[in-house]
Swiss-Prot record:
A single cellular component GO annotation: DNA ligase IV complex
Chief place where the protein resides: nucleus
Domain of life: Eukaryota
Protein purpose: Involved in DNA non-homologous end joining (NHEJ); required for double-strand break repair and V(D)J recombination. Binds to DNA and to DNA ligase IV (lig4). The lig4-xrcc4 complex is responsible for the NHEJ ligation step, and xrcc4 enhances the joining activity of lig4. Binding of the lig4-xrcc4 complex to DNA ends is dependent on the assembly of the DNA-dependent protein kinase complex DNA-PK to these DNA ends.
UniProtKB keywords: DNA damage, DNA recombination, DNA repair, DNA-binding, Nucleus
GO terms of biological process kind: DNA damage response; DNA recombination; double-strand break repair; double-strand break repair via nonhomologous end joining; response to X-ray
GO molecular function term, any single one: DNA binding
Acidic residues: compositionally biased ranges: 298-310
Protein name, per record: DNA repair protein xrcc4
Localization per Swiss-Prot or TrEMBL: Nucleus
Ranges annotated as biased composition (Low complexity): 233-258
SUPFAM superfamilies reported for this sequence: XRCC4, C-terminal oligomerization domain (SSF58022), XRCC4, N-terminal domain (SSF50809)
């Protein structure tokens, strides 16, 4: 395959002195693995035939393939690299060796091509092509002009074919424009038809939407009215309930307190029980019994949180009714035992009875069972076991704690203001478990008989 190329080189370093300098024209005839080069300065012509063997043995560097090097060499000769980043060029004198004698021909030159492999690492490949000056310049120039004429003819033929292609393409373009116009007209017509149909459908849809909206709005209005009426009813009911509650609260405030009615006998009952147990509370020299009674009283005070002693405080004045004095000499003359206590007392056998007499008037011995610590004995909370309370009467009136009756000149009773020895008369219910008796008959006894039995 033969291929020819012509290129122009300028600003080449010339150290030979055989050229005119300035512009150089380079023509190459390319074969498969070789080429023929012609260089002229428009005055002289230099030529050389570069064979494959010369390229393989002399020009190609070691470690590079032949094809890679040949492609780089061809690229450097087809067009000058003005930037000098890939290729650089230089012309120098050629020194020929003949029969071990160096014959310097001043008319021959050497065309040097520098291939730059790495600009930063400064790796270059230098290739020198010797050129011999031709004696017949006319034949060489004839070859140049023949090539130029052939090149012009080939280019003209290519131009004609390209113009024909351009005309055909232009005609196709014009036809496509006409078709596009027709398509645009048809598109506009179809769009107008579709818009007309769509408007009709849209109007029908709007009518249906209006028809469906009207009942929905009516239903919403009805729902709002119903909800408002329900809210009003609820408000009225709430107001009525509040009024009823206020009326009930007022009635409760006006009605007498039930708590006072229930607590009064309870307080009196507990005070009576505590006074009943603490009859011998004046004596400070009891052996064992005083400690038991005091422990029981302490337990009762802790359970009731001192409420009974703070709430109920008996008062004694001239208007106070006569009080029950269980330690006096005359029982039946002036005092009576309450009716609910005035029963026949039938003592039952007791477990143990211990009586200790000291300098005090009376000693009561109580057998204490293990119970929780309480301040006073209550009939409801006391353990179910038999007790025997022994009270002895002593006629020794020298004891200041013993209550005694005193009368005026008119014969009226003077009340004793010694609160510790006075017990107010309060109604007391019969407690069979406390006194250990059987209520099996209706026979009433007096206070003296009851005390004698005790």
């Amino acid at each position: 395959m033969n291929e020819s190329s012509v290129s122009r080189f300028e600003n080449i370093t010339d150290d030979s002195g055989n050229t005119n300098g300035g512009f150089y024209y380079l023509k190459c005839n390319w074969q498969y693995n070789s080429f023929t080069i012609y260089l002229t300065d428009l005055t002289n012509v230099w030529s050389s035939n570069v064979t494959t063997k010369y390229i393989e043995n002399i020009l190609k560097p070691q470690g590079m393939s032949f094809d890679q090097y040949f492609q780089l060499l061809k690229k450097s000769l087809l067009k000058q690299d003005q930037t000098k980043r890939e290729f650089d060029y230089k012309i120098d004198k050629y020194k020929r060796k003949n029969n071990n004698n160096i014959n310097n021909n001043n008319e021959d030159i050497e065309f040097i091509i520098i291939i730059i492999l790495s600009e930063f690492d400064n790796i270059n490949v230098k290739s020198s092509i010797p050129l011999i000056k031709l004696s017949n310049h006319f034949t060489t120039f004839q070859h140049y002009f023949d090539w130029l004429f052939d090149k012009y003819q080939s280019l003209s033929l290519q131009n004609q074919t390209l113009t024909l292609q351009t005309q055909s393409l232009q005609s196709q373009f014009n036809q496509s424009l006409e078709q596009n116009k027709l398509f645009q007209l048809e598109k506009d017509r179809i769009e107008s038809n579709l818009i007309e149909k769509f408007i009709i459908i849209l109007n029908e849809k709007k009518k249906k939407i209006k028809e469906y909206k009207q009942p929905i709005n009516n239903l919403l209005l009805e729902q709002k009215s119903i909800s408002s009426s329900l809210s009003n009813c609820k408000c009225n009911n709430n107001n009525n309930n509040n009024n009823n509650k206020s009326i009930v609260n007022n009635n409760k405030n006006k009605s007498p307190s039930k708590q006072q009615v229930y607590t009064t006998p309870k307080k009196k009952k507990r005070n009576y029980q505590s006074n009943l147990i603490n009859i011998d509370n004046d004596d400070d020299d009891d052996l064992g019994n005083n400690d038991n009674v005091n422990n029981i009283n302490d337990e009762n005070d802790n359970d009731n949180d001192n409420d009974n002693e703070e709430d109920y405080k008996p008062t004694f004045n001239n208007s106070t009714p006569p009080l029950l004095d269980l330690l006096s000499n005359d029982y039946d003359s002036y005092y009576n035992v309450p009716t609910n206590v005035r029963k026949k007392f039938k003592p039952t056998p007791t477990l143990t009875t211990t009586t200790t007499t000291t300098t005090t008037t009376t000693t009561a011995s109580i057998i204490k069972t293990p119970t929780k610590k309480r301040n006073s004995i209550s009939p409801q909370k006391s353990p179910h076991h038999h007790r025997n309370i022994n009270i002895k009467k002593n006629n020794n009136n020298n004891n200041p704690s013993s209550p005694m009756k005193k009368y005026n000149a008119n014969g009226t009773l003077i009340p004793n203001n010694n609160i510790n020895s006075l017990i107010p008369i309060t109604p007391m219910k019969s407690k069979s478990k406390l006194f250990n008796f059987n209520d099996d008959d209706n026979h009433d006894i007096g206070a003296s008989e009851l005390l004698n039995d005790l």
